[in-house]
C-alpha cells in the first residue's frame, strides 16, 4: 500500500544551491571590491597627506600642484578607484535590500549613472587642470 506521507528529502547545502545560477559574476564582483579596497589604501593616504599639505594654500598653488603629472595621475587613479568601489558597494546594497525587480533595476541605473557622471566630471576637471585651460 502506498504511503500518502511525503518523504523527506535529505538535501545538503550544495544540493540546494544547484540550479540557482553561476556564482562567477559574484566572485568577480567580490574580487573587484577587494582589489579596489587595497588600491584605495595608499591612494587615500596620499590624498589625505596632500590635502593636509595644501591646507591654507591659495588657488594658484593648488592648481600648480594638480598640474604636475604625478599629482594628476594619482588623483585620477584615486577618483577611478573610489567611484568604482562606490559603484560596487552600492550595487550590493541595492541588490540585497531592494526586492521589487523594476525598482531594483531603476535604482541601479540611476545610482550608477550618477556615479559615472560625477566621476567623469572629476576626471575632466583633473585633465583640464593638468593640460591647462
Place the predicted regions along the sequence by residue.
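Membrane-embedded alpha-helical bundles that constitute the cytochrome b-like, heme-associated redox core
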Residues: 1-133
Amino acid at each position: 500500500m502506498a504511503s500518502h506521507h511525503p518523504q523527506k528529502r535529505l538535501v545538503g547545502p550544495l544540493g540546494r544551491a544547484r540550479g540557482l545560477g553561476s556564482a562567477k559574476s559574484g566572485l568577480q564582483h567580490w574580487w573587484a571590491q577587494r582589489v579596489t579596497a587595497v588600491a584605495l589604501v595608499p591612494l587615500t593616504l596620499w590624498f589625505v597627506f596632500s590635502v593636509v599639505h595644501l591646507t591654507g594654500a591659495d588657488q594658484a598653488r593648488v592648481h600648480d600642484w594638480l598640474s604636475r603629472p604625478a599629482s594628476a595621475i594619482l588623483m585620477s587613479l584615486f577618483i577611478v578607484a573610489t567611484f568604482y568601489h562606490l559603484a560596487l558597494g552600492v550595487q550590493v546594497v541595492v541588490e540585497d535590500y531592494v526586492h521589487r525587480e523594476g525598482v531594483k533595476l531603476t535604482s541601479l541605473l540611476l545610482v550608477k549613472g550618477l556615479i559615472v557622471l560625477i566621476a567623469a566630471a572629476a576626471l575632466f576637471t583633473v585633465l583640464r587642470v593638468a593640460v591647462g585651460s
